[in-house]
Each structure stands twice: as C-alpha cells, then as structure tokens.
C-alpha cells in the first residue's frame, strides 16, 4: 500500500536563515533529488517570496503558520491569501512549538487548518505527544484527540499531509526507533480508517518528524506506514538531500 502514496519530505527552517543562508540552501537543493519524492520547505514569513522566486520550481514552499481568517485586526498574523499571493501553496500548522511555546489549543489549530484548505492551500497539520505523555502510556490518547479535533475542519484530505512529531524527539537528538514510529503511524492510519474512511486512510500521507537525520532516515523510510519526514535542523544543511533521497 505504501508505494501508492508519494514519499514526502518537508523541511522546517523554523526561525533560522537570512537571504545569504537561503542562497546556500538553494545551491545544494539543486543537487540530484529523487523525482519520486515530493519536497517542500517551510521558511520564515518574511522570506516566503524570496524563497519561492529562487528555489527550484519542483520544490514547494510553505509558510510555518497562518491565521484562521482572511484579513482583519490581527497584528502579527498572516492569512492563507497572503501566502498564496507570495506564490506559495503550503502551510505548516499546529507544530509542537506553536502548541507548547505559544499555547495554541487543538480547536484553534483545527480552525486554521479549515480556513487554509478553504483558501486553497495544502496543509501539513502536526500532532504528537510530550515525553511525560509517552511515559504514562498516553500516546494514543493524545494523538487521537488531536486528530479528532482536526477532522471536522478538513474538507479535502487530498491536500493534507499529517506530520507525527513526538515532542520529546524534536531538537533533542532523541529519535523514535523505526519500530516506535511505525507503531504510531499504523495506529493513526487505523484511526483514520475507523473514523474517516478506508480510502482516506490508504491515501493520506503520514510523515514522521523528530531529529530525522542522514543517519537514521533510510531505516525509518523502510517502514510500511511512514510516508516521509518533516525535518527541522537538518533541512538547513546539505544532509537534507540525503534525507530527501532516503527512498532512492
């Protein structure tokens, strides 16, 4: 079944980079990339247009956040319409740093996802559990609740890529083993089968994030339900090409 879902690798630059750094990233992104892998990079808002104008056309560009309405008195926010006006077609929503540093709750994230889809963007909603939640055997409870909040606002699953990112593995150097990651991905796919539809379960890509590196990407990519990666720090380095080519 996995080979019916196109492998997907997203890079999340977070609050990193300037034009000189972006130029460096663009130079190594011109290297040989597996044509069977869809690639998207998420850059800071102020560099959306610059990145889109200079990045090779076969690589998508994502914003790292947006708000749930088209315009208005929401200082510091950007709308999906603005992202599209910059020539970009993707947005990352609900990243653990948005949830845990900025206090965004499940319902707000769901509303953002819904509006972004209505506005014509493709969306990467992020879910994942904290270390204490995993250690208390609450992983399924947490990620299923996050999924349950998302579902009512998802109007078009073909434009959604779910990113499972265990919070305890983001930027810590700790990585879920391929077995741990595959286990959660398989359970998420079964949840979609039971709560949305078998078709959505089989067609929706579920990608893994959390200290993905050139050293561990190939083992993770061999599993049946991991359809790609959302990569943080490594997406700023030439190693990102190795990760993109994990299934090559």
UniProtKB/Swiss-Prot annotation:
Pfam families: TIM (PF00121). Pathway: Carbohydrate biosynthesis; gluconeogenesis; Carbohydrate degradation; glycolysis; D-glyceraldehyde 3-phosphate from glycerone phosphate: step 1/1. Gene3D superfamilies: Aldolase class I. The keyword Cytoplasm applies. GO terms for cellular component: cytoplasm; cytosol. Expressed in skeletal muscle (at protein level). Keywords: Allergen, Cytoplasm, Gluconeogenesis, Glycolysis, IgE-binding protein, Isomerase, Lyase. Triosephosphate isomerase is an extremely efficient metabolic enzyme that catalyzes the interconversion between dihydroxyacetone phosphate (DHAP) and D-glyceraldehyde-3-phosphate (G3P) in glycolysis and gluconeogenesis. It is also responsible for the non-negligible production of methylglyoxal a reactive cytotoxic side-product that modifies and can alter proteins, DNA and lipids. This is Triosephosphate isomerase.
């Amino acid at each position: 079944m996995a080979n019916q879902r196109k492998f997907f690798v997203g890079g999340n630059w977070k609050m990193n980079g300037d034009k000189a750094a972006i130029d460096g990233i663009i130079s190594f992104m011109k290297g040989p990339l597996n044509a069977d892998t869809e690639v998207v990079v998420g850059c800071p808002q102020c560099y959306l247009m610059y990145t889109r104008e200079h990045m090779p056309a076969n690589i998508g560009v994502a914003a790292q956040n947006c708000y749930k309405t088209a315009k208005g008195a929401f200082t510091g926010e950007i709308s999906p319409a603005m992202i599209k006006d910059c020539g970009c077609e993707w947005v990352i929503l609900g990243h653990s740093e948005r949830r845990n540093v900025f206090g965004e709750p499940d319902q707000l994230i769901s509303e953002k996802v819904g509006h972004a889809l209505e506005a014509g963007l493709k969306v990467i909603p992020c879910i994942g559990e904290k270390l204490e939640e995993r250690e208390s055997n609450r992983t399924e409870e947490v990620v299923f609740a996050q999924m349950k909040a998302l579902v009512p606002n998802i109007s078009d699953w073909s434009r959604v890529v779910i990113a499972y990112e265990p919070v305890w593995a983001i930027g810590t150097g700790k990585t879920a083993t391929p077995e741990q990651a595959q286990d959660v991905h398989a359970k998420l796919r079964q949840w979609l089968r039971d709560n949305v539809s078998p078709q959505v379960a089989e067609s929706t890509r579920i990608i893994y994030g959390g200290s993905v590196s050139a050293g561990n990407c190939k083992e993770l990519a061999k599993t049946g339900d991991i359809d790609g990666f959302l990569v943080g720090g490594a997406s700023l380095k030439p190693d990102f090409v190795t990760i993109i080519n994990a299934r090559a």
